[in-house]
């Protein structure tokens, strides 16, 4: 990004202590007067109408670089605190050369250590504050120790976090995928199955996005190379961000004294104020990271990112993305490469009153595995079964009619890594006062009701309670469901269900099956 300025030195009519005075509810309460006074002095030889690039009637931004030190560095309270603001928020109006002056940014000439050792300030704070004028948000913890304590935010990887202070402000980081997404200035591709090589995001603005099923919640993927402006970023690699701009609750705000939604946190400059509920966070390759390099993929023992890895590729509600990044690696040219796969693909189309058939397929690259763990829960009771690596289907029995369940299939690799996929389903309704019948819905049938040879029948009885056992016969010979949970109809014949109830009674239901 390249920005051009017209600059002019001005001496304001009042002392710094006047403009920099702090009130009980805000810092630099009269700073808007400094902006107005500076613009009025500059209007003699600056045509403000030339600085409305989007023709919205407003000057795009006025930047005031104040002589002296910054209150943010610990200098006296008379000094200015770097900031971006709008004149209208202070009730001020200024019109010059037919344009409205509204947006302003202020930074300071000198950096210091708690008001001592003054030195020329680096460009970091300048770039940070100017970025607010472009629409970027503060991504550090803006309420400090409030709202549960200091949140890590984006560490020093981001210009909008502590990265603006890298190398004493002399080496602020490049714009990242979050910045490009907010600005609409990058090249964004949706994460899909395939092989990827991402160049450092500063080279071409290219990054990836994965949108969860929750509107406003998504993941971003970018490559960062530890060189140039990003030199302070360890060894670089793949960074993963989890962004939440949804309407979901995002915790209590000490500053506002109420619960805020994630969307409100973005509106109110409270994005990363809660350590337990950040709305723009790095999914660190090492969740216990204490060193910046531990944020990046790959690291020792961590070359994959999926639903069962640590960290996990899951939404705030715990739902699996269904995708996994495999074989993440750095390349000599600074890029990163990886493959994206769907390790497990679920199908729960066979849903009955008391059972469900769970089927799955796996990515061919994950064939070297120990087997599968199938789990199902109604939110209270949880059950699991371990299956051989050759299995691709499992019938869950003993379910309750009209009940919501969540099923998960975990692929267990030979090295103990796991990948999973989950899906919700609701069992069918039990109809009181109706007779039991053989359930045939969903089978492949012709318009005249005959079955297509090769049709699948689930061998299930509906509307029967207190059943101890059901035995199935086709043309008098015993039959049972195959490995996929279904019986395959290959010819015409008579299907019979012998039902044995817990009270000792028995019942037979017969259905003529015709194929064509």
Go through each PLM region and give its residues.
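Beta-strand-rich modules
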Residues: 398-415
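Active-site-proximal segment of zinc-dependent metalloprotease catalytic domains
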Residues: 1-169, 176-181, 250-252, 256, ...
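Non-catalytic C-terminal accessory/binding modules of secreted extracellular proteins
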Residues: 2, 74-116, 183-345
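Conserved aromatic anchor
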Residues: 354-367
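Solvent-exposed segments in extracellular or luminal domains encompassing
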Residues: 396, 485-493
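Hydrophobic beta-strand segments within extracellular beta-sandwich modules
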Residues: 407, 495-497
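Extracellular fibronectin type III
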Residues: 414-429, 507
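Extracellular low-complexity, O-glycosylation-prone stalks/linkers
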Residues: 365-384
């Amino acid at each position: 990004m390249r920005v051009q300025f017209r600059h002019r030195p001005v001496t304001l009519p009042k002392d710094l202590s006047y403009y920099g005075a702090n009130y009980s509810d805000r810092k630099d309460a009269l700073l808007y007067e400094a902006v107005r006074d500076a613009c009025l002095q500059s209007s003699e030889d600056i045509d403000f109408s030339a600085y409305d690039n989007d023709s919205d009637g407003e000057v795009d931004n006025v930047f005031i670089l104040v002589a002296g030190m910054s209150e943010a560095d610990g200098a006296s309270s008379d000094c200015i605190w770097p900031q971006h603001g709008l004149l209208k928020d202070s009730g001020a109006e200024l019109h010059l050369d037919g344009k409205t002056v509204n947006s302003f940014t202020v930074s300071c000439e000198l950096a210091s250590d708690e008001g001592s050792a003054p030195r020329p300030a680096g460009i970091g704070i300048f770039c940070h504050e100017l970025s607010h004028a472009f629409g970027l948000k503060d991504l550090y913890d803006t309420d400090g120790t409030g709202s549960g304590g200091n949140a890590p935010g984006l560490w020093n990887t981001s210009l909008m976090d502590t990265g603006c202070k890298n190398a004493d402000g002399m080496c602020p980081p490049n714009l990242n995928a979050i910045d490009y997404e907010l600005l609409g200035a990058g090249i964004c591709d949706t994460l899909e199955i395939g092989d990827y090589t991402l160049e450092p995001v500063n080279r071409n603005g290219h990054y990836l996005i994965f949108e969860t099923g929750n509107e406003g919640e998504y993941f971003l993927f970018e490559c960062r190379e530890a060189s140039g402006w990003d030199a302070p970023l360890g060894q670089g690699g793949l960074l993963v961000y989890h962004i939440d701009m949804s309407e979901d609750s995002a915790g209590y705000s000490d500053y506002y004294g109420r619960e805020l939604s994630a969307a409100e946190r973005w509106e109110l400059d409270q994005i990363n104020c809660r350590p337990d509920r950040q709305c723009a966070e790095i999914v660190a390759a090492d969740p216990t990271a204490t060193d910046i390099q531990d944020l990046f993929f790959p690291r020792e023992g961590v070359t994959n990112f999926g639903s069962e890895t640590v960290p996990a590729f899951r939404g705030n509600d715990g739902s699996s993305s269904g995708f996994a990044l495999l074989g993440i690696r750095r390349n000599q040219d600074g890029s990163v490469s990886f493959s994206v796969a769907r390790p497990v693909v679920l199908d729960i189309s066979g849903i009955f009153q008391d059972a469900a058939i769970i089927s799955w397929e796996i990515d061919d690259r994950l064939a070297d595995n120990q087997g599968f763990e199938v789990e199902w829960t109604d939110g209270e009771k949880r059950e699991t079964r371990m299956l051989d690596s050759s299995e691709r289907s499992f019938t869950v029995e003993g379910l309750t009619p009209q009940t919501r369940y969540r099923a998960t299939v975990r692929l267990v690799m030979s090295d103990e890594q796991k990948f999973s996929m989950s899906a919700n389903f609701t069992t069918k309704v039990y109809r009181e006062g109706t007779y039991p019948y053989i359930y045939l819905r969903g089978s492949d049938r012709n318009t005249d009701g005959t079955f297509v040879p090769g049709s699948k029948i689930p061998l299930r009885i509906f509307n029967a309670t207190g059943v101890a056992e059901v035995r199935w016969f086709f043309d008098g010979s015993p039959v049972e469901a195959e490995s996929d949970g279904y019986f395959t109809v290959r010819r015409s014949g008579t299907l019979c269900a012998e039902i044995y109830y817990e009270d000792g009674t028995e019942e037979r239901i017969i259905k003529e099956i015709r194929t064509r």
